[in-house]
């Protein structure tokens, strides 16, 4: 099944039960595909903001929803789940499955809304492009590493960024005018610093672009480090400019930026904390603040992903072990998080969360229960209200609402 590191990441939930392991916030300018209610696609041969989009009026009619899964585990899916959701009620309706994409555990959409990208989380990792208008798989490219677990599209739309968990590396692929991927432009392995306590090597977990677009940041759970790079937008090559270190053993997993662009919030998987980080857009330097509580007690929790509302007033953290969402008030223009409460997620092992494009709904992909929970988000209070019964989807590990 691959290396020890990949097995731990993929099956971390086995410590508390059976099962298989953003934002992904939807791009707010992404139109729906031509036929969002298309039925099951035929078998084919083988994003990028980290905060909520600005609120707008809820669109009318069904909106597309894509659900990532594992295809190579017992009880897993057979491809990318296709569904629609009602932007007012939050109700999800299944429309089919896009087959021909193996282990699509994380998804992102191109800024123009025409192409969907998926990782193929396997030992020989790859990324796959899918044209949304007719659900055609445009092809896959090697990530140069094992267990790719995250990807995002650079805001310019010309480069795909991906993170290889097992090999602790990040990759860059060119995107052509059709949305298809070219040969890998760069691959960087996190060889320094040395792995943190209890880690056997680097484990890249996320690769995203800063709000100003000037830098790309890679979060590595294995080295307790966030790496900042400059991306050469002509060649796709990466140049490291800074490293930010958490406390030893924190195990950083996912980062999200405040809309103001001067602060970011880091979810630490291993020590069950979050941290406020100051960010200097000129030099790309991130400074990690003190660890803060997730509000889940002392038990094993595995925080997964953190999101911030478009008005910068509230943040939400997915807690896989506690099966909850922690709600924080964001204060001092982004410099401070104040814990408010935790809300049951109505599912088991919420691995990923995402806002709808208008920010009125929050989707949680619950890996072990095989469900997607939807919550109404109160703009003024930040309170979450469950929108009906969770939607059944096998080994749901990523929900991408457009």
What is each PLM-predicted segment?
Residues 84-89, 132-133, 174-181, 230-236, ...:
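Short loop/turn segments immediately following beta-strands, especially the blade-tip
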Residues 70-72, 121-122, 165, 175, ...:
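Short loop/turn segments immediately following the C-termini of beta-strands
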Residues 2-4, 10-29:
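N-terminal export signals
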Residues 76, 101-111, 144-155, 192-211, ...:
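Beta-rich, blade/repeat-based domains predominating
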Residues 93-98, 137-141, 192-197, 239-245, ...:
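A short beta-strand motif characteristic of beta-propeller blades
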Residues 23-61:
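N-terminal low-complexity, Pro/Thr-rich disordered segments
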Residues 138-205:
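Asp-box/WD-like beta-propeller blade repeats and closely related beta-sheet repeat scaffolds
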């Amino acid at each position: 099944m691959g290396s020890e590191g990949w097995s731990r990441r993929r099956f971390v939930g086995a410590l508390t039960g059976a099962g298989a392991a953003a934002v992904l916030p939807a791009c707010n300018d992404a139109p729906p595909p031509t036929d969002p209610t298309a039925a099951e696609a035929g078998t084919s041969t083988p994003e990028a903001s980290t905060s909520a989009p600005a609120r707008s009026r809820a669109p009318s009619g069904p909106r597309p929803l894509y659900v990532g899964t594992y295809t190579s585990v017992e009880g897993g899916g057979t491809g990318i789940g296709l569904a629609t959701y009602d932007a007012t009620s939050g109700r999800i309706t299944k429309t089919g499955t896009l087959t021909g994409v193996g282990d699509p555990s994380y998804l992102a959409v191109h800024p123009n809304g025409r192409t969907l990208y998926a990782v193929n989380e396997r030992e020989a990792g790859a990324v796959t492009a899918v044209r949304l208008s007719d659900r055609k798989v445009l092809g896959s490219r090697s990530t140069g590493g094992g267990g790719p677990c995250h990807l995002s599209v650079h805001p310019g739309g010309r480069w795909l960024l991906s993170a290889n968990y097992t090999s602790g590396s990040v990759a860059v692929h060119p995107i052509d005018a059709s949305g298809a991927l070219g040969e890998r432009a760069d691959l960087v392995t996190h060889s320094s610093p040395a792995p943190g306590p209890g880690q056997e090597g680097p484990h890249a977990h996320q690769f995203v672009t800063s709000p100003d677009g000037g830098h790309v940041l890679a979060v590595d759970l294995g080295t307790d480090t966030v790496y900042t790079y400059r991306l050469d937008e002509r060649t796709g090559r990466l140049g490291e400019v800074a490293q930010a270190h958490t406390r030893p053993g924190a195990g950083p997993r996912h980062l999200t930026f405040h809309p103001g662009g001067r602060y970011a919030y880091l979810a630490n998987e291993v020590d069950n904390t979050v941290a406020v980080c100051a960010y200097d857009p000129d030099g790309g330097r991130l400074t990690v603040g003190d660890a803060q509580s997730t509000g889940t007690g002392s038990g094993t929790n595995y925080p997964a992903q953190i999101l911030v509302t478009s008005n910068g007033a509230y943040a939400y953290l997915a807690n896989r072990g506690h099966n909850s969402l922690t709600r924080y008030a964001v204060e001092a223009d982004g410099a401070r998080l104040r814990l408010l409460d935790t809300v049951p997620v109505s599912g088991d092992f919420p691995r990923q969360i995402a806002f709808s494009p208008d920010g009125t709904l929050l989707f949680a992909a619950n890996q072990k229960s095989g469900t997607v929970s939807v919550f109404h988000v109160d703009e003024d209070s930040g309170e979450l209200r469950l929108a009906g019964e969770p939607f059944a989807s096998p080994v749901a590990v990523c929900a991408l609402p457009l």
